[in-house]
Amino acid sequence: MKSADIRQAFLTFFEEHGHTIVPSSSLVPANDPTLLFTNAGMVPFKDVFLGRDPRPYVRATSAQRCVRAGGKHNDLDNVGYTARHHTFFEMLGNFSFGDYFKRGAIRFAWTFLTERLGLPADKLWVTVHVSDDEAERIWKDEIGIDPARFSKLDEDNFWQMGDTGPCGPSSEIFFDHGPEVAGGPPGSPEEDGDRYIEIWNLVFMQFDRDSAGTLNPLPKPSIDTGMGLERVAAVLQGVHSNYEIDLFQNLLNAASEATGYDDTSAPSLRVIADHIRSCAFLITDDVLPSNEGRGYVLRRIIRRAIRHGHKLGAREPFFHTLVAALDAEMGAAYPELRKARPRIEKVLLKEEEQFARTLDHGMGLLTEALETLDGEVLPGETVFKLYDTYGFPFDLTADVCRERGVTLDEVGFQRELEAQRERARAASQFGADYTAALDLEGETAFTGYERLEDEARVTALVDREGNALAALEAGQHGVVVLDRTPFYGESGGQAGDTGYLEADGMRFQVTDTQKQGGHHLHHGVLVEGRLDVGASVTPRVDASLRAATMRNHSATHLLHEALRQVLGEHVQQKGSLVTAERLRFDVSHFEAMTRAQLDEVERIVNAQILANAATRIEHMTLDEAKAKGAAALFEAKYADSVRVLTIGADDFSIELCGGTHVARSGDIGCFHILSEAGVAAGVRRIEAVTGEGALAYFRDQEAKVARVAEQLKAKPEQVEARLEATLERNRTLEKELERLKAKLASATSGDMLADVREVAGVKLLAKQVEGVGGKELRGLLDQLKNKLGSGVIVLGVAGDEKVSLIAGVTDDLTARLKAGDLVKHVAEQVGGKGGGRADMAQAGGSRPQALPDALASVPSWVEARLGE
C-alpha cells in the first residue's frame, strides 16, 4: 500500500466512524509562543483539550504536518544517518473531546490495523501504563491480545502536556519485524533494537495535574492518538527504513538525478530528500530564511541540504529543483504546497546562490584542514577561522567532522570567539570621537528588539582614525553609520552585536557595534565590493550570537535576585559584562561566598529557568517603576520613561534594562557558575555560562574526567575512589621516604663529624650536603648539634637554580654568635637573604654555583666574630 493510500485510508476509516476530518494546520503554531514548530498531531487541538476553544465536533481526525528541527525536539543532527529520524513527518491522529474514551480508542486502533490494513495480530505488541488496569482489561478481555505480547511500563506510558494540566496514561502499539532483526520487546534490556517499532500511541487524557503534583480526574476524559505515516508505511511495504518507502524513494531518485549521484542509499541523499520536505512546507507556511527564530532554523536546514549536495559533487544550484518531485508526491494531499510551489522554488534558489561562494571556499579549506589534521580533534582556532574569516557555519563544520569521525574543539572555538570580541572592544576604544568628523542629524533608529534583519541607508562612513569617508573599498576597515539598524550597540554591560551589512556584490563584516552621540557605529571590514555613503544595505545580525547574549543577559537578572535572596538585601549590582560566551556580574558583598551559597544561588536560577515563565517588557515612568519594586543601578541616570524587564515565575525579578532578552526564562536553557572572586574591597565577581556555553563547559569537564579515568585505568564513576586510593598510597610512600631519608641523614651525620674543625676554640662545621630535603636538613642539624655538644654548624643544599641553607649554634655560644647573622652572611653570597633565632636560622638563595665559596668563607667570618 502506498503512503498516499495509507493516509487516505486512515482519514476515511475515522470519517466512517463519526470523526470530522480536520485539515493539517500550519507548521507555525497559532497563539502558542512555547513552540517553535508544530511537532505533534495534537498541537492544533491543545486549546480544545483545555476547554478554551469550543468546536462543533467531539470527534476529529487529521494528517498533521510536523517539524522537529529546533528547540526541545530537535532531530536535525541524526537525519540521514538513522532509519527513522526526520525533520519533517506526518502524524496521523484521531481525537475525542469528552466523547469516547479508552474502549473506543483501543477498538478503533485494533480494527484499523488488523482489518483495514491487514496486519497480523501475532505481529503486534501492546504496552500500557503500569497503573492502568482498565486498559489492560480491555486489551486482554475484549480485544483478546495474547498476554505473551503485552507488557506494562512506567514513565514510557504516561503523557503530559506540561508540568501542570491535562495528562494521563497511554497505550502503545508496536510492530514486530521478526527474530531475524536484532532487538527485544518494549521494557526489555534489548528494547532499543529495531525488531519492535512503535507505530501508534494512544493517550488517555483523564487527569489534570495541579501545581502540587496531584492528579485530579478530568470531568470529560479525552483521547489523543498519533501514528507516524512514514513508520506504518515502512511496515506495510516490508522495509526496515523509512527512507525505503515509496514516498522517499521518489524523492531520493529526484535528488540522485539533481546531484548526479547514483547510490540512493547514501546518507547525503537521504538528508536532501528529508530536508526538501521540511523546507518546502515551512516556506508554504510563510517561514522565510533569516537569522532569527524559525527563519534561522529554516536557513540551517537549507544550508545543510546544500552542503550534502556539494559533498556529492553538485556545484550548481539543485535543491530548488526538487520541489517539483515533492509536489508530485504530496501536492494532491496538501494543495497549499502546490499553490506555493513557485514561491518555494524562488526562495530556495536565492538561498543556494547566496550560500554558493561561502560553501565552495569553506569546504575546500575544511577538507584541507581535515586531510592535514594530526589527531582526531579539529582545533577551535581552525573552526573559528572558517566561521569568522570565510563565513562557514559552525554547525556545517560539525556535520562534516561527524562524517569523518573527527571531534570539534568547541571550547577552543568559543575561546577564539571571545578573544575576537575582546579585540573588537579594545579597538573600539582607540581614536577620536567618530561623530566629531560627521555632520549628522537625529539618531540611529534601533529596530533590534523586533527583528534581526532590516533595510537601511548608509548615512556616514569613517576610517579607524576618525576621518570621514565617501566610500569603503574591499579589505578596508572602517565604521558604518546607518539611519536604522537591528544591531544592538554595546551598553548596559551587554556587548554589541556582530553580523553583516549586505547588498548586491557588497558585504561588510560587523565585528562590533558601539553607541556614540545617539548613533550606532558598526565597526568592521569590507569583505567584498564597494560601500558608498547613501547606499541601501541589509543589516543582518548574527542570530546565534545574539541569542546566546540574550540568554546570558537574562540570566544576570535572575542571578541578581538570587544573590539578594541568598546573601541579603544589601547586595547591589556594581557592574556587568554580557557576551555570547559568558556573563560577568559584580556585586557588593563583604566576604567570599561559600560553596553552599554558590550552589543555592545556582539552584534558584535554574529553578526559575525550569519554570519557563514568559518575560514581560513594559514602559513606564521612573516613579512607577520604583513603586513596582524595580531594581536599578544606584549611580545610573535614567530618562523619565524607562524600560522595565520582568522575568521569572511570580515576577521573580523586576529591573530597569534596555538590553535584549529571551522571550521566556526557559530559553536560557541552564545556568552554571564558573567562578566567584573578589575584584575590589567589598565587591565580588561572579562568572557564569548558560545554554550552549554551559553544555560546552560540561562536555569539557566530562572529557577531562574521562582522560583522568584513562590515566588511572578506571571507569569515570570510579575516578574519585581510585584517585583517593592513589593519593593515600602516595602519602604512605612519602612517609616511608621521609623515614628512609631521616635514617640516611642520621648515618650521614656521623660521617660528617670528620669534617669538623676548630676555630678560635669553637668546633665549626660548614658543609654542603647531597640528597637531603628541607625537613631532613633540620633533622640533620639537630643530630649534629647533639653529637657536637658545643659548636657552630652551617649546612647548604644546592638544587636546580636554588639553594637551601640552615645554621645552628649551641646554646652555650649564642651569647657570642647568632645563627641568624651567620645564615644571613652565607645567603647574601648565594643571591638570597634570611634570618632567624639565635640558635637556629634558615635561608635560601638563587645561585647554587656560589655555594662552595660561600661555605668556605664561614671560618674566617666566625673567627672574626668570636675575636671581637
UniProtKB/Swiss-Prot annotation:
It catalyses: tRNA(Ala) + L-alanine + ATP = L-alanyl-tRNA(Ala) + AMP + diphosphate. Its main location: cytoplasm. Its cofactor is Zn(2+). The keyword Magnesium does not apply. It comes from the Bacteria. Residues 831-851 are annotated as: Disordered. Its EC number is 6.1.1.7. GO terms for molecular function: alanine-tRNA ligase activity; aminoacyl-tRNA deacylase activity; ATP binding; tRNA binding; zinc ion binding. It holds the Pfam family tRNA_SAD. The keyword Glycosyltransferase does not apply. It is an enzyme of class 6 (ligase). GO terms for biological process: alanyl-tRNA aminoacylation; negative regulation of DNA-templated transcription. Zn(2+) binds at H553, H557, C657, H661. Keywords: Aminoacyl-tRNA synthetase, ATP-binding, Cytoplasm, Ligase, Metal-binding, Nucleotide-binding, Protein biosynthesis, RNA-binding, tRNA-binding, Zinc. Consists of three domains; the N-terminal catalytic domain, the editing domain and the C-terminal C-Ala domain. The editing domain removes incorrectly charged amino acids, while the C-Ala domain, along with tRNA(Ala), serves as a bridge to cooperatively bring together the editing and aminoacylation centers thus stimulating deacylation of misacylated tRNAs. Belongs to the class-II aminoacyl-tRNA synthetase family. Catalyzes the attachment of alanine to tRNA(Ala) in a two-step reaction: alanine is first activated by ATP to form Ala-AMP and then transferred to the acceptor end of tRNA(Ala). Also edits incorrectly charged Ser-tRNA(Ala) and Gly-tRNA(Ala) via its editing domain. This is Alanine--tRNA ligase. It comes from Chromohalobacter salexigens (strain ATCC BAA-138 / DSM 3043 / CIP 106854 / NCIMB 13768 / 1H11).
